[in-house]
Each structure stands twice: as structure tokens, then as C-alpha cells.
Regions:
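Conserved segment of the helicase C-terminal RecA-like domain
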Residues: 367, 371-429
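Non-catalytic terminal extensions of ATP-dependent helicases
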Residues: 329, 334, 348-352, 442-743
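SF2 helicase catalytic motif II
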Residues: 96-100, 107-155
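Conserved C-terminal RecA-like helicase domain
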Residues: 50-54, 62, 69-78, 253-254, ...
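Conserved pre-motif I regulatory segment
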Residues: 1-26
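Conserved interdomain linker/interface between the two RecA-like ATPase lobes of SF2 helicase motors
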Residues: 146, 153-155, 160-172, 176-283, ...
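Conserved nucleic-acid-binding Ia/Ib motif block in the N-terminal RecA-like helicase ATPase lobe
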Residues: 49-101, 169, 180
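Walker A/P-loop NTP-binding motif
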Residues: 15-22, 32-49, 142-148
């Protein structure tokens, strides 16, 4: 099958797959682990069977569909939520959520019949399986692994992980057959990490050069100091005349353009800001393409995008195409998906010499480059609501884009800081620190309870969460027993004498809050206590008292933790009680109302079902219904006190659910204007086109689920009312299709 020599880890993985055994391959970006998944596809087809290939994001699914279609033609299908093409094909590419929803539906007659089937399925390839660690989505991967029948073979492809053995042991026990852990740190194309002036920070053997980095920092600050003095002299001479930022000698833009001229290309600049991606791209001062290449770019852009005349009215389109003709581009999640794809297509063909991108470009998309440039080692963390240093796994994944197998003898990773550079200790820890461990992110939420009761698949006892939870409980119990044994060694006399130290601490506390007169009295008591507790014996008692306090504090902390672990499991029972009270379940099975809720994946299942079954929108026109449904779309500035009257009462009645949902009125007026035919809502409301497209496609899915509920209820009035509404949502530049499906 392969006309080149395989690496050792690839040979081991292929051997396991040939024996129909499961494999987890952990390797760095660019190491060739994708080949393992491709062999599983070949092996399954040779047996006359089918294979699923799952990815964490739609864009990666689209690209994988394109890659495999070039090899297997019409035997490849795709299911992503927005795109459905040939779901019964021999090879089906899908997002992991699609597989999870199918697995709960499989074998149960309730609800809408799924479009996918496990019939004749031999294997599932999970690409980027380290997403199991993602706090918001990791549960999906874990549910899939538990729900898949043991006879279906698994190929798990992951970035490097720290101590993945416990996870592999769980998977082996779960499936009742061997799961091979195949890990490699080897890269065919080694990486050299350096500063903007070529000083090596970390070499190809992953040795961090601490002193060299320190020396570079000193030189950097010296140059910045000279730049500051120069600017002050110029300012005095010019008497306040404004100097254009982009031409200032020594400024970031000046350093960036000098680096672009001398560096090996193509190059990928990671910029952790959508706005600045576009800003820096527009400041590249050099045309990097020949006139012939520019003509080719124009032809490719016209060929792929001529079907979308609405793009011509968008400022961002003209901004991007102007840069593309110079060999420069930007790529971030705020862009229209098809514009991101045209950038990827041109990058893959070698027409993009300099690309400014956010972190999303590092996820899965197979776009290697010669050089990677970091403009910062910090990114915004939504959870922390602040900037933080990149985790080692994040840095490795992004840096791993450098070095093209078969083209480059090494990959170059450069640090070109916009602001002050990070300290040597911070950079060393980031580059050489531990990889991520596999930590269960399992969520036993309302969607899980509904899905498990509807399918009859109660899986909590089989989850990796339960394995980790049980191990954690046992470890804490063992530690508690050890603490108890040590506490039992203290004699009654020692405890009495140790208590005297507690009394002294109480006196010390009185000094903090007493009056001047009372403090004087207390200080005299403390002095008297100190004078009567001297000598080796009391020194020994003091140490024993400190140790006793440590043990008691640790014991209380462990007991609190154990209580919280037990309460977590009780959450499922509390949710079941609530669902029973609200009429969703009966006798540990779903009622008709529960079946309706189990059809909802894109919005909160309980709240949406309550709105429907209480007929709160029955008399509304279709546009108004969709505007209300838009409240289920997430937005950064979410507000659970939505003013939408139709939802307010239901939210109050379901107060117990409050922590489970996010509703916002952010999209309410936007959607109303869009449905009325306003094509300029993004400009009017200041919304990035990519964000708007994602929101409208998700809203279209919510509308489909609303119609599914109406179908199950045989509500012909609602079905007819909603007829044609999807065409009003998905129109113009809201394009569900992918360029990858047509090339």
C-alpha cells in the first residue's frame, strides 16, 4: 500500500490493526500519525466493511472528505450537521457529536430515525482524540468510546500525552480486547526554535539554551532603549510632527517586515487576535508573488468563488483578495468559512508565502509550512478571563506546523514578540514542560439522562470518569487511613500539652482585635506562657503540635473532597427526580414529552420542550418563532435574564435548571432583520461574518429540531407554518457548503 519506508511506530500500529486490535497513537504534529488512520480505512474496505472517521471540527471534516475522496471517490460520504452527503457510504467523515447522537439512537424505535447506520461498520477512527480533555466537549468522546459495540475496532490518534497508560488500561478493560499504546516523540523533520535574530532557544534534541535566551533578552532591551532615545530625539527635532507607526525603525512592524524579507518561506505567523491578524497582514510591505503567480491566484479565486456574487459587496472580501494577490493572507474564525477555505487551498498550492492566523489553524488542518513565527507566548483564556502562557501541549501543536515532510530538512520556529519577551524560566517551562494527561470531562447533564433513558444505555459505571473517580476515592481512603494511624500515635498527655499551643494561638488572635488596654494584658499572658514553655521538651511538643495540626487539616480536606465526589453521583438522581416531576420520565423510561426533549441537541432540551408543549409560540408567526429560538444561540456577552417574555416564565418554573442553560437576547433583533431581508446586519450590528454564519447555521439546526418535535406531535399547523423558514435563514453569504466538497 505504501511505496516508502514506514517509521517504527507506524509499523507497530499497522500490525495491531491487521490483527483487528485497538490502538492509541500519540505523536507530535507532523510525525505521520494520520497514515495509521488511513491504513485502518484500507484494511476495513479490504474486508468488505465500512469505516467512520471522526474529527473535532467541521472544517477538518470537510478537508478530510476532500483528501479521502481523491483516493476513494464516491465511496466517501460526510455528515457534519450543516452538510449531509451519502451517509450510507463505505467511508463516512463526521464530527464526533454526530456519532454520539447516532449511538444513543441506534437500536431504539423512539423519536426520529437517524440518517446514519452502524450496519456493516468495522472501525471508527478518532482524529485529534486529545479533545477528550476539552472541558466543554470532552464528554462527547468519552460517551462514544463507551457506547460503541466492542466488536467495532478503534483507532485513536492524539497529540503527545503524559502518562496515557491508565486511559489505555481502561479502554482495554471496557472493550475486552487489547488496546495498544503506541507513542513516539520522534519527528522526521526536526524543529529548531530561535529568536528573531537567529539565536537558538531550543535545538533539535529539545535542549533549552537558557543562557543564550537570557543574552538575547538583554540585547532586546538594549535595542528597545536605544529606539526609545532615538524617538525622543526625533520628536524634539520634529517638534511634535507625527511619524507613521508602520515605518518607525525598530517597531514591531519594522522588525516583522525585515524578518519576512530574510526568512525561509512559506511562513505562518501565529497572532492571538483576529483583528491583529488582519492588521499585520495589511502591513506586509513586499509583494511576494511573480506576475504569473498573481494571475494564477486570480484564476483560482474566481473559479471557486464566482458562484457567490454577494461576496462582491463585502469589504472583507476585497481586503483579503488584494492580499492574496501579494502572496499574503489571514485566517481566523471570524471569517466566512468559504474565505478561510480559499486561503487554505491557496496555501496548500504554495501561493501563500506569509499567513497570519489564530490558534485554530493549528487544529488538525493539514497545512505544514517551512517556518512558524510566534508573535506572543500568551493567549486569552475564556475561563480565566485573562491572558495566560501557552500550555506545553498547545505550543508543541502550533510549533509542529513547521517543517514539511519530504521538502524540508528542518522546521524553523521563531519568536518575534509584539510586547516584552517572556522570562527564560517561563519559556523553558512552556517548551519543555509536561504534556496533558487524559482527564475525564464527562457530564451527567439533562441531555445525558434523557439519552441514556431513551436508549436504555446507562453508561455511567463504564465511563473513564467512574474509573478515575473510584481510583481517586481509594487513594483518598488510603491516605485517610495513614493519617489516622499517625494521629493514633499521639498520647493523651501529648495531646493535652499540644492543646496549650492552641491556647497560645488564641491569645495571639486576641491581640489583633483587642483595645490598647486589653492588648497589654494579653501580651503579659503570652510572655508568661512563653517563659513557662522553654526547653527541649516544649520544643519537641511544638513540632508535634504543628504536625498534628497539619494532619487534622489534611484529614478534613480529604473528607470534604470525598463528600463532593459522592454528591456528584447524586446529581444524576436529582436530575431524574426533576424530570419525573416535570413529566419527562415515568417508571425509569421516557414519556412522550421526554421523547420530544431527547430530539433536542442544539438548544437546551428541557427549556425548548417546555416552550413547545406549553404552546407558548403556537399563535406566533414563523419569523417571531425563529427570533425566540435565537435566544438559545450562545454569545460571549450572555445574559440569563433574557427579556424575551415567552421564555421568562418557563425559566422561573425550571429554576433548578438555571446552571444548565445559556439564553441571550443578543441575536433577537439581528435575526429579525435578517429574516426581513436585511443583507447588511453584520455591518449594522458590528458582527464578524464568520460568527454570523455559524450562528445562522446553528439556528437552522434548532429550527429543524423544533419541526422534528412538531412532526412527532403530528402538529401539521406548526409544520406548515415553518415551511420555507430555513431558506430565509440560510441564504446569501450564509453558505452551508464547503469548497472542499467540489474540488
Amino acid at each position: 500500500m505504501f511505496n516508502f519506508k514506514l517509521d517504527s511506530f507506524q509499523e507497530k500500529a499497522i500490525d495491531a490493526i491487521s490483527k483487528d486490535e485497538n490502538v492509541l497513537v500519540t505523536a507530535k504534529t507532523g510525525s505521520g500519525k494520520t497514515l495509521v488512520g488511513e491504513y485502518q480505512i484500507h484494511h476495513s474496505l479490504q474486508k468488505g466493511k465500512r469505516v467512520f472517521y471522526t474529527t473535532p471540527i467541521k472544517s477538518l471534516s470537510n478537508q478530510k472528505f476532500h483528501d479521502l475522496k481523491k483516493i476513494y471517490g464516491d465511496r466517501v460520504g460526510i455528515m457534519t450537521g450543516d452538510i449531509k452527503f451519502s451517509p450510507h457510504a463505505d467511508i463516512v467523515i463526521m464530527t464526533t457529536e454526530i456519532l454520539r447522537n447516532l449511538l444513543y439512537k441506534q437500536g431504539t424505535p423512539i423519536g426520529i430515525t437517524p440518517e446514519l447506520s452502524l450496519q456493516n461498520l468495522d472501525a471508527v477512527v478518532f482524529d485529534e482524540v486529545h479533545y477528550i480533555n476539552d472541558p466543554s466537549r470532552g464528554s462527547v468522546w468519552e460517551e462514544c468510546l463507551v457506547l460503541l459495540p466492542p466488536e467495532i475496532n478503534l483507532v485513536l490518534l492524539s497529540a503527545t500525552l503524559d502518562t496515557p497508560e491508565p486511559f489505555v488500561h481502561w479502554l482495554t478493560d471496557l472493550k475486552g480486547k487489547m488496546c495498544h499504546l503506541i507513542s513516539t516523540e520522534y519527528r522526521v523533520v526536526p524543529l529548531i526554535h530561535m529568536t528573531e535574530n537567529g539565536e537558538v532557544i531550543m535545538d533539535a534534541k529539545d535542549t533549552f539554551h537558557f543562557e543564550k535566551y537570557k543574552a538575547w533578552i538583554r540585547k532586546y532591551y538594549s535595542q528597545q532603549d536605544e529606539l526609545r532615545k532615538h524617538k525622543e530625539r526625533v520628536k524634539a527635532r520634529e517638534e511634535g510632527q507625527v511619524i507613521e507607526k508602520e515605518v518607525r525603525v525598530g517597531s514591531f512592524l519594522d522588525r516583522m517586515n525585515k524578518l519576512i524579507l530574510k526568512m525561509d518561506k512559506p511562513a505562518l505567523f501565529f497572532v492571538f487576535s483576529r483583528k491583529m491578524c488582519e492588521e499585520y497582514a495589511s502591513k506586509v510591505s513586499t509583494d511576494l508573488l511573480t506576475s504569473s503567480e498573481t494571475a494564477d491566484v486570480r484564476h483560482i479565486v474566481k473559479y471557486h468563488l464566482h458562484k457567490y456574487p454577494e461576496l462582491q459587496t463585502m469589504e472583507g472580501y476585497h481586503k483579503l483578495t488584494g492580499l492574496l494577490e501579494k502572496g499574503v493572507a489571514f485566517h481566523h474564525s471570524g471569517m466566512l468559512p468559504i474565505l478561510k477555505e480559499i486561503v487554505e487551498i491557496l496555501f496548500d498550492k504554495g501561493f501563500i508565502k506569509i499567513l497570519f492566523a489564530t490558534e485554530t489553524f493549528a487544529v488538525g488542518i493539514n497545512m505544514p509550512t517551512k517556518t512558524v513565527v510566534f508573535t506572543s507566548y500568551r493567549k486569552y483564556d475564556d475561563a480565566a478571563e485573562n491572558l495566560r502562557v501557552l500550555r506545553t501541549s498547545e505550543y508543541i501543536q502550533m510549533a509542529g506546523r513547521a517543517g514539511r515532510r519530504g521538502k524540508d530538512d528542518k522546521g524553523i520556529v521563531i519568536y518575534l514578540p509584539i510586547h516584552e519577551p517572556e522570562t527564560p524560566d517561563v519559556v523553558k517551562e512552556m517548551m519543555t514542560g509536561k504534556r496533558a494527561t487524559v482527564e475525564s470531562q464527562m457530564k451527567f447533564d439533562y441531555s445525558y439522562v434523557l439519552a441514556s433513558l431513551g436508549s436504555g444505555k446507562t453508561i455511567e459505571n463504564d465511563t473513564y470518569w467512574m474509573r478515575q473517580n473510584n481510583q481517586e476515592v481509594e487513594q483518598y481512603k488510603d491516605e485517610l487511613a495513614t493519617i489516622k494511624r499517625e494521629l493514633d500515635t499521639f498520647t493523651m498527655k501529648e495531646k493535652e500539652h499540644m492543646y496549650e499551643f492552641t491556647q497560645r494561638a488564641q491569645l495571639q488572635e486576641q491581640i489583633r482585635y483587642g483595645t490598647a488596654e486589653s492588648k497589654k494584658v494579653v501580651q503579659q499572658k503570652i510572655s508568661k506562657w512563653d517563659n513557662s514553655h522553654v526547653g527541649p521538651y516544649w520544643d519537641s511538643m511544638k513540632k508535634k503540635h504543628e504536625r498534628h495540626e497539619q494532619l487534622v487539616a489534611r484529614s478534613h480536606k480529604i473528607e470534604t473532597t470525598l463528600d463532593s465526589l459522592k454528591l456528584f453521583l447524586k446529581d444524576i438522581e436529582l436530575r431524574k427526580l426533576f424530570l419525573e416531576k416535570q413529566g419527562y420520565i415515568e417508571n425509569n423510561g421516557l414519556t412522550q414529552k421526554g421523547i420530544l426533549a431527547s430530539e433536542v441537541h442544539e438548544a437546551h432540551p428541557i427549556l425548548l420542550t417546555e416552550v413547545y408543549t406549553k404552546k407558548l409560540l403556537q399563535t406566533n408567526e414563523s419569523n417571531e418563532i425563529v427570533k425566540v429560538l435565537s435566544c438559545f444561540l450562545e454569545h460571549d456577552e450572555t445574559d440569563t435574564k433574557s427579556p424575551i417574555a415567552q421564555l421568562g416564565k418557563q425559566m422561573q418554573e425550571c429554576e433548578i435548571l438555571k446552571t444548565d442553560w445559556i439564553v441571550t437576547d443578543y441575536w433577537y433583533d439581528v435575526v429579525g432583520d435578517w429574516l426581513e431581508g436585511n443583507n447588511y446586519v453584520c455591518e449594522q450590528y458590528g458582527i464578524e461574518h464568520g460568527n454570523f454564519v455559524r450562528a445562522m447555521l446553528k439556528l437552522a439546526n434548532i429550527v429543524r429540531e423544533w419541526v422534528n418535535i412538531a412532526t412527532l406531535q403530528q402538529d401539521t399547523e406548526m409544520i406548515e407554518k415553518m415551511n420555507g423558514i430555513e431558506q430565509k435563514l440560510v441564504r446569501g453569504f450564509v453558505i452551508p457548503n464547503s469548497l472542499y466538497l467540489r474540488i
